[in-house]
Amino acid sequence: MMAKWMSVAQVKDKIKESSAEEVTAGYLEVIEKSKINGYITVSDKALEQAKKIDVEGHEGPLAGVPIAIKDNISVVGLPNSCGSKILEGYVPPFNAHVIEKLLDAGAVILGKTNLDEFAMGSSTETSYYGPTANPWDLERVPGGSSGGSAAVVAAGEAPFALGSDTGGSVRCPAAFCGVVGLKPTYGAVSRYGVVAYANSLEQVGPLANNVEDIAILMDVIAGYDRRDSTSIDSKTEYQKALVDDVKGLKIGVPKEFFGEGIHPGVEKAVWNAIHKFESLGATRQEVSMPNINYALASYYIIAMSEASSNLARFDGTRYGFRANGENWHAMVSKTRAEGFGTEVKRRILLGTYALSAGYHDKYYLKALKVRTLVKQDFDKALSTVDLLMAPTMPNPAFRIGEKIEDPLTLYLSDVNTCPINLAGVPSVSVPCGFTDGLPVGLQIMGKPFDEPTVLRAAYTFEKNTDYHTKRPPEVA
């Protein structure tokens, strides 16, 4: 059997030794024996795609390299379920911008990964297709909403994957599964072809077993797209930033990210990581970001409000699941009642309430004002330091079913990740240790479009530690 957990460079070497078709077949064999329910759909065209790469001698940067795609990103010929019954049977007739870029680079799409329904969640438990298990402990969640993408990378079922991050949906599962996950600056990667949850917050982001593969993927998918009015051509060269050197780098540690309820093992691992940076020549100072305390409430009001608007389009009329009804109104009502899961309905209702005439100013408008204050906190802190560092998640992965019946507790999981989405800045989660045998993630945040500094710090940490080389015993 093919070796699991290969880097992109190792995959490319393996392709030279054998073929893209053989490498793809190896991953498909691993997926077939999976214990984690990481994929919703495995592509029946992956081998054909890989064989075509071999025959045509594609010379793109990802020629023949397999990749997994979160199932809210449109791929021609593959279902795009968003983990929801309401999109059952829907196959998009177009590719997302990031998929176009990947195919141009020669990547082979293995399949579509599991997620919280419409990317609304932090545990990948709300999927219509069942929960995904964490490869480190099959009774625990992988995080969410891109839990399938993180889990398949951690389990060796793909060398890397794409996810989307609205309030931590790439970084949370990266931390829980012990992989690297980047939320790029808002606008760095086109959202065209990504089914919208909260447009003003979300970004497509990569997950991989090492920082170098994150940079390789960003060099492919980032850049301007005229079909996404929020995309920006920053002309960033991500791989060139990967230098093993943090001497003189100023690190800010925001005390608000180490608040009440943080797991002692997580806190210890993160502080050990920060001290490691100091030993490598970086300097540290405490910073205060007082409005972070209001970020979670602001985030959920904004996200749910945008979701209630975005999800109005799913009614069974043109595509996806359709319930029977005696007239059009009855059909739409029944379709949405049966097609959406409990958590999605909850967020639609709360978002509609926040946008209603009597409460718009009290909730939605106030949340937007708080968002501005949070952004100002980041601007102020990052004017005095190069990077901010904190725990990605306040706790390690929790058990499947432990929090799903308590939405508020589940929402609180996003306390350290959602402020970054409100501010629109880049943030990467890297493995920095373990507690109770479960991975811990260090979150490194930077100035807008300063992914090079963020990735340089992450790369240096990786080069001087071995946490990213650890593999889950459950699937080894």
From Swiss-Prot:
Keywords: ATP-binding, Ligase, Nucleotide-binding, Protein biosynthesis. Allows the formation of correctly charged Gln-tRNA(Gln) through the transamidation of misacylated Glu-tRNA(Gln) in organisms which lack glutaminyl-tRNA synthetase. The reaction takes place in the presence of glutamine and ATP through an activated gamma-phospho-Glu-tRNA(Gln). Heterotrimer of A, B and C subunits. The active site is at K70 (charge relay system), S145 (charge relay system), S169 (acyl-ester intermediate). GO terms for cellular component: glutamyl-tRNA(Gln) amidotransferase complex. It catalyses: L-glutamyl-tRNA(Gln) + L-glutamine + ATP + H2O = L-glutaminyl-tRNA(Gln) + L-glutamate + ADP + phosphate + H(+). Belongs to the amidase family. GatA subfamily. InterPro entries: Amidase (IPR000120), Amidase_CS (IPR020556), Amidase_dom (IPR023631), AS_sf (IPR036928), GatA (IPR004412). Its EC number is 6.3.5.7. One of its GO terms (molecular function) is glutaminyl-tRNA synthase (glutamine-hydrolyzing) activity. This is Glutamyl-tRNA(Gln) amidotransferase subunit A.
